[in-house]
């Protein structure tokens, strides 16, 4: 299916604050966002280098700093395939970094997974220290995406690595706390929905429902096969499963909610969930209301196939209105931002759907994105990895401060009206009682 061209409603509200050039190119699995929650990004290049990006106070100004991190046991002739980071689930402490690479061994490359984690008290979050503490695992398959997911094991939560391979399968690596190392365990023990695959998984997304033991897992394969599963973690039962076959490899699948409400552990979101599916040959689509309609209610992202293949996507709130936008980045050097317009927009029903808000051009193909607060000011930056390096895009501080002031005025006005209402009610009480 071919999508129609779309016209952007306005200009991109983000400006480029910095650009860091790579010594060699990265790939779609080469960015790990927000390491340790400390506003640091990790970007891996094919030639075995890992760069850490952060902002720091230099001469009373916040400036971007890029530093090469020396991760142990990555040979000079290695080609890095994927990188991921996570914080251990409480009460455990520490940052874990995983890096897959292929070592040049003459006729045939040898694939490895290195897992870095420092158990020394005081060093659990120190990247320089973590980079020296390595578990080196030789793989029997070619690795693709390395990601992580939090899963319920007995009464506690555990974060595990999930690695897709060309065997084709998903491999699970879980920490053995007693031995202070990670071990591969059968994926079906914790993720029964990730078995029986006939094509390599190019992207996997696991979304836990807050306040419940349920989750949605979505995967997209090289063959165009897409699977979404609704699972109860306690019983390990697959409650519902849907699949569809699209044309061409699937570059990204993301489970998300279009609601403006915030998910909290105390108040699970009573909203419909959607899944974004980005294909390398077709327009990106969103399947809405998964739990009720499966993969039946499909909405196109208009014009998303007009700039060569979609290589990566992100669902996040860019315009700061509390509702998510869908960002689509292409090999054709374009970043596209879409917004869902539903009944609340006042548009006729025929015009409900995703509309192109803005687009931005870059000078080389786009590979990966992350939306994280690098400066520590509460506003998230958009990191965009292109073939040439990392672009950091920021909000206009003038526009952001105007938005904050407008919302503060609104809050003050609401509070004033509430207090006025209480005073009016209290004043009317005695008079009403006397009259009766």
From Swiss-Prot:
The modification N-acetylmethionine is found at residue 1. One of its GO terms (biological process) is cellular response to glucose starvation. It is found in: Lysosome membrane; Cell projection, Lamellipodium; Cell projection, Stereocilium. One of its GO terms (cellular component) is lamellipodium. The lineage of its organism: Eukaryota, Metazoa, Chordata, Craniata, Vertebrata. The keyword GTP-binding does not apply. The keyword Acetylation applies. Disulfide bonds: none annotated. The gene is KPTN. This is KICSTOR complex protein kaptin. GO terms for molecular function: actin filament binding. Part of the KICSTOR complex composed of KPTN, ITFG2, KICS2 and SZT2. SZT2 probably serves as a link between the other three proteins in the KICSTOR complex and mediates the direct interaction with the GATOR1 complex. May associate with F-actin filaments. Keywords: Acetylation, Actin-binding, Cell projection, Disease variant, Intellectual disability, Lysosome, Membrane. It comes from Homo sapiens (Human). It comes from the Eukaryota. It is linked to Intellectual developmental disorder, autosomal recessive 41: A disorder characterized by significantly below average general intellectual functioning associated with impairments in adaptive behavior and manifested during the developmental period. MRT41 most consistent features are global developmental delay, macrocephaly with frontal bossing, high levels of anxiety, and some features suggestive of a pervasive developmental disorder. Less common features include fifth finger clinodactyly, recurrent pneumonia, and hepatosplenomegaly. As part of the KICSTOR complex functions in the amino acid-sensing branch of the TORC1 signaling pathway. Recruits, in an amino acid-independent manner, the GATOR1 complex to the lysosomal membranes and allows its interaction with GATOR2 and the RAG GTPases. Functions upstream of the RAG GTPases and is required to negatively regulate mTORC1 signaling in absence of amino acids. In absence of the KICSTOR complex mTORC1 is constitutively localized to the lysosome and activated. The KICSTOR complex is also probably involved in the regulation of mTORC1 by glucose. InterPro entries: Integrin_alpha_N, Kptn.
């Amino acid at each position: 299916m071919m999508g129609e061209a779309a016209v952007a409603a306005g200009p991109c509200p983000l400006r480029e604050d910095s650009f860091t050039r790579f010594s060699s190119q990265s790939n779609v699995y080469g960015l790990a966002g927000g390491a340790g929650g400390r506003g640091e990004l990790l970007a891996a290049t094919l030639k075995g280098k890992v760069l850490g990006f952060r902002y720091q106070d230099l001469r009373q100004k916040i400036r971007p700093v890029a530093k090469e991190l020396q991760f142990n046991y990555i040979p000079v002739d290695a080609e890095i395939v994927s990188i991921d980071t996570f914080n251990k689930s409480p009460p455990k402490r520490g940052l874990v970094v995983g890096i897959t690479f292929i070592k040049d061994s003459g006729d045939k490359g040898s694939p490895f997974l290195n897992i870095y984690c420092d158990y020394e008290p005081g060093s659990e979050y120190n990247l320089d220290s973590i980079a020296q503490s390595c578990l080196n695992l030789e793989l029997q398959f070619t690795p693709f995406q390395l990601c992580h997911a939090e899963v319920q094991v007995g009464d506690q939560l555990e974060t595990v690595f999930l690695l897709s391979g060309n065997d084709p399968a998903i491999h699970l690596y879980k920490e053995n706390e007693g031995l202070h190392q990670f071990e591969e365990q059968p994926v079906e023990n914790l993720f029964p929905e990730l078995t029986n695959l006939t094509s390599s998984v190019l992207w996997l997304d696991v979304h836990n429902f807050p306040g419940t033991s349920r989750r949605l897992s979505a995967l997209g394969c090289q063959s165009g096969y897409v699977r979404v599963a609704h699972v109860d973690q306690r019983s390990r039962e697959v409650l519902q499963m849907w699949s569809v076959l699209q044309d061409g490899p699937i570059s990204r699948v993301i489970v998300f909610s279009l609601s403006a409400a915030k998910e909290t552990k105390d108040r699970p979101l009573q909203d419909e969930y959607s899944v974004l599916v980005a294909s390398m040959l077709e327009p990106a689509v969103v399947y809405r209301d998964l739990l009720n309609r499966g993969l039946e209610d499909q909405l196109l992202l208009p014009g998303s196939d007009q700039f060569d293949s979609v290589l990566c996507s992100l669902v996040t709130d860019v315009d700061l209105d509390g509702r998510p936008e869908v960002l689509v980045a292409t090999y054709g050097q374009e970043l596209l931002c879409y917004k869902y317009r539903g009944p609340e927009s006042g548009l006729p029903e025929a015009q409900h759907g995703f509309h192109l808000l803005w687009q931005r051009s870059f000078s080389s193909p786009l590979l990966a994105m992350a939306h994280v607060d690098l400066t520590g000011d509460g506003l998230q930056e958009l990191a965009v990895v292109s073939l040439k390096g990392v672009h950091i895009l920021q909000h206009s501080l003038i526009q952001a401060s105007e938005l904050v002031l407008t919302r503060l005025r609104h809050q003050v006005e609401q509070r004033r009206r509430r207090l006025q209402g209480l005073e009016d009610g209290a004043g009317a009480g005695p008079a009403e009682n006397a009259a009766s």
